[in-house]
Structures are given as structure tokens and as C-alpha cells.
Amino acid sequence: MTQRYLFTSESVTEGHPDKICDQISDTILDALLSQDPQSRVAAEVVVNTGLVLITGEITSQAQVNYVDLVRKKITEIGYTSAENGFCATSCAVLVALDEQSPDIAQGVNVAQESRQQLSDEALDRIGAGDQGIMFGFACNETPEFMPLPISLAHRMARKLAAVRKTHQLPYLRPDGKTQVTVIYEDGRPVGIDTILISTQHTPTIGEISDEAEVQAKIKQDLWTMVVQPVFSDLTVKPDQNTRFLVNPTGKFVIGGPQGDSGLTGRKIIVDTYGGYSRHGGGAFSGKDPTKVDRSAAYAARYVAKNIVAAGLAEKCEVQLSYAIGVARPVSIFVDTFGTGKIADERLLELVQQHFELRPAGMIQSFGLRHLPSDRGGRFYQDVAAYGHFGRPDLELPWEQTDKAALLQEALPKTLSGAVSV
């Protein structure tokens, strides 16, 4: 009997209050690492009507004008008029930063293995910045090895922002959310059940002032300018049975920080796999690479993606866990949900053999300290919106599949000939 079910994921635009905070936090990180790659950063941001608060702990030799960074980022996002309820030039910016705790720093500067002289390897000298668990995931539903629901939600959110910024739909304002419900049969996506877009907009559109007519205009424009282009190159498409919902409350004029306060780290499911995979709970934005919440989540994705790209599984989830001040993972767990071509225990052995999962090793392998300076002063702020994974537009080091050929060698000879990497 065919197993049929629905799965839903959401995304938000760069103008969503929480995403404003994520982007400001990572803009600060970019600026600090560009000048001082050894910066220790935990930058948290809060936004509300007319207010931006920067707080957290930073230890760095860099000289940064935080107020200027904030205003430039808010301008880039699109809040340039008081009519939006939040404006880059008029909002207040408060800065309340401390240095990193020396109790934490001592464990990160020199790892337990090195302090106790259990290992002399250079990569054992940087311990994890905190305890915690991190998950990475990959599946073969899309070319970028991401689940289809979150991939579609991100595509629509990016397109929604694009038609606003290019003035194709000039009545749109920066805040917006997208959501896609995908129909699955026997574990494979086969159709689209529901598409939902909530987008901030002006009270009137040209001479149209009636609320119902305004919403009808928005709905038609979004179908033509956003939904249809997003699905144009896909085999799974909406059909006559697909529900298309736009601003279901009736209107969305008040938005951004005026409508809701925002906070760094509140969109962790949007940042990752849209709920399709588990999440360890730690946010990414505003954290330097010694924070394993970020670097180990990137590494776990790298491991899972290479396993799927190698044809060793159709889907794969990797869990890593760390102790503060300890370089080596406390545990590694690999789960292929019954889709593995070889046993999960064998995959675990391959992960331990071929992947560097100590904080210093991950930082070095991906170049995490130097990516901002290597890419013109901005890197992390660009992954702070529209997902940290499955981003071919950004050439992310943890999205490489350079280990796939090596892993493929572990396939039984009867299977390896049927898989191409």
C-alpha cells in the first residue's frame, strides 16, 4: 500500500525582524574577522520599533564602528523609509558589549588534550567553545542534496525579495514569509499541496485602495512573478488542486520591527533543514568559528552530504557532540534511515577515518576564520538569510562533495559500478 503524507517547511525574507538581527550579528562577525581572524565573537542583536540593541561578548583587536555597520545593513535590507515603521537613518542603535569570559577562553585557547599533554598535535590545541549537540543532514531530493520543502520555501523567499528590490513589484515592503507543503508518496515528493506567502505591502497599489482588491492584485502578481518562476525548472509543480494562500489575515501593512520584535537566533529551523532533520538547538549567527554550534553543524552537513553524494545512502543524518574545552567529539552518530548501501556502523568508521571533526581542524579545513577577508569583507552575513545549506550561489566550503569519490570506494563492488559521483 502506498504511504502518502504531507510535509511543510517555511522560510522568511531578509526583512523579517529575526532575520534582520541574524544579518546584523553576522555583519559584525564579518567586520571583526576581516581585521582580526582570531576574534572571539558572540554578538546578539535585538530590534524593535525604532531601536537596535547590540549585546554579547567580543574579544578582538579589530576597530569597528558598530553603529555605522548597523545602519548600512538595514539600508541594504530595504528599511530606508519611516513609512515602513523602521528606518536605517533614524533608528536608535545601542551597544552593550563585554569581553569573552576568561573561564571560557582558557578552554578554547588550549584544549584539555593539550593541557593534560594527552596529544601534541596542533589541532588538539583548540577546544570546543561550548558543550552541545549538532546535526547535519542531506538527502537526494534536490540537486543541492536538501529536502524539497525547505528548498522551495527558500526559493520563494529569495524571489519575493528580488521582485521587491528590482522594483518589479514596487508596492512590496521588506518583511515576508513563505511556506510550502509537499505531498510525499513512499518517501518521495510527488506534488504540492499548499503554497503560502505572507508579504508586507503598501496600503494601496496605485489607484487601488479597496482591501479586497489590493489582496487580489497581490495574489495574482505573486503567482505570476514569484511562484511560476520558482517552479519553472522543476518536475514537481503545483496543479489545479494546490492551495495558494496570500496574506490570509487580510492585509500585512504593519511589519518588520514595528510589527514584531526581532532577536538573533530565533530562526534556527529556517537556517537548517526546515524541520526535516533534527536540530541540536544552537543558533549560528553572530558566533565565531570556535563556537561548535556553528562550525560543527557545518561539518556535520559536510559529512552527511558527502555520504549521500557518494551514493552510500539516499538520506543521512549525522549527530556530533562536544564538551567545552575538549577538542575531539564526545560522540558521533550516523543514521541513514534504512537507505544505506552499507551498514551505518561501517559509515561511522569511514567518518572517523576521513573527516576532521576537531574545532581547529574544521576551522582550518573550511577556512572559517579567513572567509570574510578572502571574500571582500563579507561572508557570514550572506548565509544569515535564506539558509546556511544548499546554497550553490555562495560556494560554501561545507557544501563541497570532494570526499564523495573517496567514500565511494567503500561500496561493495557489485554496487559501486551503478553509482556515479
From Swiss-Prot:
Q: How is the cofactor bound?
A: Binds 2 divalent ions per subunit.
Task: Write down the EC number.
Answer: 2.5.1.6
What GO biological process term is on the record, naming one? one-carbon metabolic process
Is the keyword Lipoprotein in the record?
A: no
Which GO CC terms are listed, alphabetically? cytoplasm
Q: Where does this protein hold K(+)?
A: E44
Positions that bind L-methionine: E57, Q100, D260, K291
Pathway this chain belongs to: Amino-acid biosynthesis; S-adenosyl-L-methionine biosynthesis; S-adenosyl-L-methionine from L-methionine: step 1/1
Recorded catalytic activity of this chain's protein: L-methionine + ATP + H2O = S-adenosyl-L-methionine + phosphate + diphosphate
Q: Which residues bind Mg(2+)?
A: D18
Q: Keywords of this protein's UniProt record, alphabetized?
A: ATP-binding, Cytoplasm, Magnesium, Metal-binding, Nucleotide-binding, One-carbon metabolism, Potassium, Transferase
Query: Where is this protein localized, as stated in its record?
Result: Cytoplasm
- Say what the protein does: Catalyzes the formation of S-adenosylmethionine (AdoMet) from methionine and ATP. The overall synthetic reaction is composed of two sequential steps, AdoMet formation and the subsequent tripolyphosphate hydrolysis which occurs prior to release of AdoMet from the enzyme.
This protein's name: S-adenosylmethionine synthase
Organism, per UniProt? Answer: Cyanothece sp. (strain PCC 7425 / ATCC 29141)
What is the taxonomic lineage of the source species? Bacteria, Bacillati, Cyanobacteriota, Cyanophyceae, Gomontiellales
User: What's the encoding gene here?
Assistant: metK
